[in-house]
Amino acid sequence: MTKFSLLDHEAVPKHEIMSEGELKSVLSKYFIEKEQLPKIKVQDPVCKEIGAVVGDVVKITRKSQTAGEADYYRLVIE
């Protein structure tokens, strides 16, 4: 059976685990706490592929017709 990367599929946006510095900047920009971010399960196939663990924040960069690209942030939970 051939293994392929989910991230190589055109319908899957770019996912990356944020560093503490990047996260701090985003949280202060939006005046929120980490726990207020939308959630994503650690069992999500993309989380498994990028090696995200509970407590990480994943930055998702999607293509947007109006903005070109738009960033979304998700807190990894159990």
Swiss-Prot record:
InterPro entries hit by this protein: Arch_Rpo5/euc_Rpb5 (IPR014381), RNA_pol_subH/Rpb5_C (IPR000783), RNA_pol_subH/Rpb5_CS (IPR020608), RPB5-like_sf (IPR035913)
Name of encoding gene: rpo5
Enzyme class of the recorded protein, top EC level: transferase
The organism of origin for this protein: Methanosarcina mazei (strain ATCC BAA-159 / DSM 3647 / Goe1 / Go1 / JCM 11833 / OCM 88) (Methanosarcina frisia)
PROSITE patterns in alphabetical order: RNA_POL_H_23KD
Single GO molecular function: DNA binding
Entry EC number(s): 2.7.7.6
Keyword Nucleotidyltransferase: yes
Substrates-to-products reaction catalysed: RNA(n) + a ribonucleoside 5'-triphosphate = RNA(n+1) + diphosphate
Entry's family note: Belongs to the archaeal Rpo5/eukaryotic RPB5 RNA polymerase subunit family.
UniProt subunit comment: Part of the RNA polymerase complex.
Protein role: DNA-dependent RNA polymerase (RNAP) catalyzes the transcription of DNA into RNA using the four ribonucleoside triphosphates as substrates.
Keyword Secreted in record: no
Protein's UniProt name: DNA-directed RNA polymerase subunit Rpo5
Record's GO cellular component terms: cytoplasm; DNA-directed RNA polymerase complex
Gene Ontology terms: biological process: transcription by RNA polymerase II; transcription elongation by RNA polymerase I; tRNA transcription by RNA polymerase III
HAMAP family: RNApol_Rpo5_RPB5 (MF_00025)
